Structure formats: C-alpha cells, structure tokens
C-alpha cells in the first residue's frame, strides 16, 4: 500500500512540476492555456479559474498534460475563428522553443535545488581514490592492482574522489577503461575491463539486479567539507550533469546492444522504489524525487517525436530553414515516435511483471 501511495504522490509531484513549467512560460508569452491535468482519463475533480483554465485531477495517475491553445490546429474546432493573439503557433520560434523546453528544464531546476540544499546542509564527504583492498579473482587483481595504489586518472580524466572512479567506469560501460595508477611515487597505466555481476540486496526478493565492477574497495578514510550556498549550487549542478551522463550512456549502450533492455523499469519498479524511499525518511525521499526529476527532464529532451525534445527539433528546423516541417513528414515522424514510446512502455511493464513474479 505504501508503494502505491508513494507512486501516486511521486508521479503527481513530478508531473505537476513539469507541466507547470510549460504553463508558466506559456502564460508569460500570453499564450492561452485551456487545461492543466494531472493524470489521464476521466476527471475525478476539477475547477475552472478566472482565466478559463480547467485544472483537474484524472483517474489514471501515469502522467499529465497542459492543453495549450493553438498547439495543434488540426485538433481545433474548425467552426470557430482562431484568436491569433493567444495561439501557440502564432508565436515566434524562440517563444515556442522556450515554452516547450520549460517542462524538462524545470525538472532539472527542481533536482538542482534539492541537491544544493543537501550539499549546503550536510556538506560534502569525499573518499580519496586510494585502494584499500582488491577482490580476489576480479579484473583489478588480474591487472595487478594492490592495496595502497592511488588512482590518479580514469580514461585520461583526473579523479579526486572514489566516487569519480566509479562514475567514469560506469559511463564507459562494458568497454575497457584506462587507469593511471600512482604507486610509491611512480605512475603507470593499466587497462581494465569491468565485469558484470548480479547482486541480491537483502530487502529484495529478485536476484537479477546487474551492475559492473572492477573489484576494488576504497580505503577506509574520508574527508568532510562544509559547503556554502554557491559551492552547494556548483556541486548540485555537477551532480545533475553526472547523472544525465550516466543515463545517456546507458541508453546509448542499450541501442548498440551492450546493455540489456531488461534494465528498464516501469510503474511497478517506480512504485517499489517510491515506497522504499518514503519508508527511509524525508531525506531519502527528497533525493529519490531529485533523481527521478533528472531522468524525467532528460528523457523528455530526447529528440523523439511526441516528446518535448521531438517538438524542439521541429521548431529548430523551422527556425533554421524558415519553413514548417511538411505535414505528412511530421505525421509520419510523430507516429514513429509513438511506436517507439509504446515499445518502451511494453518492455518496462514486461520487466516489471517478470520481476514481480521472479
């Protein structure tokens, strides 16, 4: 029950924030907003404000939308004259671009605010990139890494924290990573191929959670630093960028077949994680919201027709060429985008069901 409640609350918060971004910028540019909906299907409750916007909560809590006047004229009442002053498609390319981009960007803004709050309040704890132990029969042992070795670079990128090492290896995925090691004041380079392992968290019933490892354990020491507002904001932005890079890398590896689509989670997976984060307390839940918000913002920026990113591409095409995309071409691309989204939804739900009964 906690998972169901957590899922509804979490999705409602993220969808509201996302759609509110579209709403605010549309209103700023004097574009008429007709509806603001949390959920799909039959309206459970609704109210119409003085500006004529119908605010409602619908039966199926799997998303939401803002109905913007003039967004798609093919769906408008042909018997009524269009009010060009408040129509979306009568605005400039820049104004339309900002309206469409506002949803994903406000998701990023929410995540940055939450992360910044945590950094300012709790500070930052860094674990030096020094190896404390090497796992037997691991890639690290085969590469002759030893306790006390300091990792200076990963794939030519300097690392200052053990988390940096983990991130760079994960971003590189199943490809070999190049580590610059400092041992007794001497530096040398090793190439190491991570191995895929299956982990079974104690609280989980299924055992099909996959991750990558090279088999090193950090030395048991840490450095805690207090961070001011500007420092917290900077760290929050970097954290958001790192999370986006990891997600994009995972997507690209799935496309080329280096990672399995089994890793895609659907509503049941989100519901389970929502329940666990709520049970873990306010701090854990806020971090969960921030991480989901990053992913929601990023996924909506992907150049897939029907998503915000796809519409941004159409607007950019118009801005560069001075011409609207051909209606037939646009419709074909929108249908293709819908097929891609439906395909991903089927995979996500299928994975959820499989994990539920595994």
From Swiss-Prot:
Its main location: membrane. InterPro entries: PDZ (IPR001478), PDZ_6 (IPR041489), PDZ_sf (IPR036034), Pept_M50_Zn (IPR004387), Peptidase_M50 (IPR008915). It is a multi-pass membrane protein. The keyword Lyase does not apply. The active site is at 19. Keywords: Cell inner membrane, Cell membrane, Hydrolase, Membrane, Metal-binding, Metalloprotease, Protease, Transmembrane, Transmembrane helix, Zinc. One of its GO terms (molecular function) is metal ion binding. One of its GO terms (biological process) is proteolysis. Signal peptide: none annotated. Its EC number is 3.4.24.-. One of its GO terms (cellular component) is plasma membrane. SUPFAM superfamilies: PDZ domain-like (SSF50156). It is found in: Cell inner membrane. Residues 102-186 form the PDZ domain. Zn(2+) binds at residues 18, 22. The chain crosses the membrane at residues 52-71, 97-119, 285-307, 332-351. Its cofactor is Zn(2+). NCBIfam families: RIP metalloprotease RseP. Belongs to the peptidase M50B family. PANTHER family: MEMBRANE METALLOPROTEASE ARASP2, CHLOROPLASTIC-RELATED (PTHR42837:SF2), REGULATOR OF SIGMA-E PROTEASE RSEP (PTHR42837). This is Putative zinc metalloprotease RC0203. It comes from Rickettsia conorii (strain ATCC VR-613 / Malish 7).
């Amino acid at each position: 029950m906690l998972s169901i409640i957590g899922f509804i609350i979490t999705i409602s918060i993220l969808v509201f924030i996302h759609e509110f971004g579209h709403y605010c910028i549309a209103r700023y540019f004097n574009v008429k907003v007709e509806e603001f909906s949390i959920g799909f299907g039959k309206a459970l409750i609704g109210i119409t404000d003085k500006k004529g916007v119908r605010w409602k909560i619908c039966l199926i809590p799997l998303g939401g939308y803002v109905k913007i006047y003039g967004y798609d004229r093919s769906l408008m009442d042909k018997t009524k004259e269009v009010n060009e002053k408040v129509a979306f498609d009568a605005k400039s390319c820049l104004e339309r671009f900002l309206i469409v981009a506002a949803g994903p960007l406000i998701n990023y803004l929410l995540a940055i605010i939450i992360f910044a709050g945590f950094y300012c309040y709790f500070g930052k704890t860094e674990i030096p990139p020094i190896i404390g132990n090497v796992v037997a029969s691991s890639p690290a042992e085969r590469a002759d890494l030893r306790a006390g070795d300091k990792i200076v670079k990963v794939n030519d990128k300097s690392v200052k924290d053990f988390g940096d090492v983990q991130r760079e290896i994960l971003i590189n995925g199943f490809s070999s990573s190049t580590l610059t090691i400092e041992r007794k004041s001497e530096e040398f380079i090793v190439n190491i191929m991570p191995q895929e392992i299956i982990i079974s968290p104690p609280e989980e019933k299924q055992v099909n959670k996959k991750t990558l490892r090279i088999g090193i354990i950090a030395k048991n020491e840490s450095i805690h630093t207090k961070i001011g507002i500007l420092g917290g904001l900077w760290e929050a932005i970097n954290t958001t960028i790192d999370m986006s890079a990891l997600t994009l890398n995972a997507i690209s590896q799935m496309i080329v077949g280096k990672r399995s689509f089994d890793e895609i989670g659907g509503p049941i997976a989100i519901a389970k994680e929502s329940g666990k984060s709520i049970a873990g307390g306010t701090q854990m839940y806020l971090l969960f919201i921030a991480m989901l918000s990053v992913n929601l913002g990023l996924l909506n920026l992907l150049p897939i027709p029907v998503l915000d990113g796809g519409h941004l591409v159409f607007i950019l095409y118009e801005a560069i060429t001075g011409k609207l995309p051909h209606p037939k071409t646009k419709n074909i691309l929108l249908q293709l985008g819908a097929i891609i989204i439906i395909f991903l939804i089927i995979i996500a739900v299928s994975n959820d069901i499989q994990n539920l009964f595994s």
